[in-house]
Structures are given as C-alpha cells and as structure tokens.
Swiss-Prot record:
Cofactor note: Binds 1 Mg(2+) ion per subunit.
Originating gene: purA
Pathway in which this enzyme or protein is active: Purine metabolism; AMP biosynthesis via de novo pathway; AMP from IMP: step 1/2
Binding residues annotated for substrate, in chain numbering: 300-306
Organism listed in the record: Edwardsiella ictaluri (strain 93-146)
Protein name: Adenylosuccinate synthetase
Amino acid sequence: MGKNVVVLGTQWGDEGKGKVVDLLTERAKYVVRYQGGHNAGHTLVINGEKTVLHLIPSGILRENVVSIIANGVVLAPDALLREMTELEARGVPVRERLLLSEACPLILPYHVALDNAREKARGAKAIGTTGRGIGPAYEDKVARRGLRVGDLFDKASFAVKLKEIMEYHNFQLVNYYHVDAVDYQSVLDEVMAVADLLTSMVVDVADLLNKAYRNGEYVMFEGAQGTLLDIDHGTYPYVTSSNTTAGGVATGSGIGPRCVDYVLGIVKAYSTRVGAGPFPTELFDSVGEFLCEKGNEFGATTGRRRRTGWLDAVAVRRAVELNSLSGFCLTKLDVLDGLDEVKICVGYRLPDGREVDVTPLAAEGWEGIEPIYEVLPGWKESTFGVKLRDGLPQAALNYIKRIEEVTGVPVDIISTGPDREETIVLRHPFDA
C-alpha cells in the first residue's frame, strides 16, 4: 500500500500550508486539492522566488508530481486560466502536470455577482467573504442545479442549462438585490473559450487515487482555509462553504476514510483571522501590531489586513479532535523572536464566571468570553532560518513543548522562515 498524507490548517486559515505542502511533495507522486476554490491563497518561496497559488495545488512547481483538482473544489474557469498562464510564462508545464475531476462545480460570473450583492445587503453583518463566488457555487451544487466541468463535454446541452440557471439567478439579482443582471452571452462565450482546455485535463480522480494507493504511491492532500472555518464545525456563520476538516478529504476526492494514514495540522505560532467572526485572543495593542507587521499578515487572496492574537490552544484542541491529527507543523516561530513574553490561551472564562476548556459551537456562544492565559518567557535570539532543533533558543523549545503538552499532539515540523529550506523536520509524515 501507498501512503495518503493530509495537510490542513488548524486555525482560521493562513497558517502556512502552501509552503509545507511544497516541501513534503518532494516524496509524493500526487498532490490533491479537495475543497474550497480560488479563495485560498497559498504562498511558496523557493530560492527567494515567491509564488502565490489560489486554485492549482502547491505541488505544481515540482517535476514528476501530478497536481489534481478533485470534485470537492469549486472551479472558476477564468481563475484557473489566469493561474495557468502566469505559471506557464515562468516555464512551468502546467498542462503536463495538472488533472481535473469532471465533478468539479463551476464558479461563473453570476456566482460572483450574487456573492457581492449579498455581502453588501448584509451591511454591518457581512461575513467577510472573498467575493469570489465560492458560497453561491456550493449552494448550486447542493441544490442540484449547478453546472460542472463534465457538462462541458456536451456544449449544446451546456448552453441550454446555463440559460436556465442564469434566468433563475438574474431574477434574484434584479428583483431582490436590485443590481444589474449578468449577460448570458458573455458568460457562455467566456466558458466556451476554455471548454476544450478544461475537458482535456479530466480524469476519473477517485479511480486514479485509489489505484495509486494500492500501487504503493505517496499522495498529499492539500487543505485550504482552516478547521475553524469549516461549514459544520467552524464559528458559524462566520465560516467558509466547504468542509475544511479531514473528513472532507474522502468526500472531496473519492478515497475511503480508512485510506488516510497521517493528518498534519499546520498551526501558526500565534493566531490570525481575516474578516468578521469570533477571535478571543485578538490583540489591539502594540504586540498585535508587532505580529501583523513582522509576520506580514496581509491576505494573499484579498490583501486585507489580518487580525492577530496569541495562540489559542483551546481552539487548536478542537482541531485536534475534529481531524484526528497525527502531528503538527508549527509555522512562523521566528515572528515571536524579540518578545519579552509569549502567551498561550488554555481556557475561556464565560460571562457568568465559569471556566471552560472547549470552544463553543456557534458564533453566538463566543460572545463575551475571555481568554485564560499561560505566560511563558520570550526569547531575544533569532530563530529565522534555523534548520536544526538544537539551534533554537531554550525558551523557544519550552514554548514548543508546552504547545505539545496542552494539545496532546507532537510538533513534527518547525518552520523558521518562508523558504522551503527554512524548515526543521523532526518526523516526516511519509515515514510516520
């Protein structure tokens, strides 16, 4: 048998998954995106050169690695084409390395229009979506009216289906949201221009992955967003529209649950969040500003400033449970360099004075809770670029050890910088 390794975020996204996937794919045959869409922003730095991927898996820069966009991903044709063009201009043979599932739902311009119209209508209660049509595309999928990549094999039938669904959505746009309708012909022309390209990359992804596993191949499954944004288990309604937890791997790609061998949870050494929603450890002081500036905490997809705060071990423990995590990769440890002290949230104090060590299930339950902190000594030495565990300051090692103790999960990888080489691998997921 082969080995299937899942890499996913344990917080609210932006944990550094792209770099880690790129690093680990040195030993993988396939890298698979199984949920989300081009609302992801995975940043890779290789030999100082920065690449930001939104839809294409992070393994695309590796020779002899096949990248797959599986059925759980909502696919925007224009975004895919744009990303492919940018990579090909840099000499990356994307068409030789990328495969698609025919079951991928398509994100089309009317989804984007709906997304933005809804956010505007929510006013102060806006979710803070990326405005890229992700949610409306998933809605169409669940309502069984969505168009999929496989529909492009019959272009005449696709045109008819598109007209029907656009009449439905344009009625909403014009009569409920009071915005302009989306032009049918322009959408049809846009999709037809890339239809042959998309269908040329289609394979039976589930069959391919199951055969690869039986044949001893190593496969990496790349999560997007983070556990606390999961549609079912996140801080609802301030969540994304897909299952970001490990359970989404099986439904989003077509492998069975028992075929997952190792789940690597990416945990940032502090916490960040983009957009609205609960964030108990959020900092509004100079330390929060320090983390934002030093950590360059601006969204790779939207450019929005990320909210920053101390590490929330209560929330991370929820991620441990939801994903059956095998190990952690701790990222951005170097951002904490220079602080006099570092804090870990180990519990919450409710408005009525009770103390709990588990996260609420919905956004309303987070209102008024206060973090309970453990305070540890900081370190002045630089951890940036350190490649051996023994090269880390003792205070940093103590911080890592305490994270392991309060979560019950070992830190198997430590990231000390953005480049793939700036990493300490204590236990490789494919060897675990």
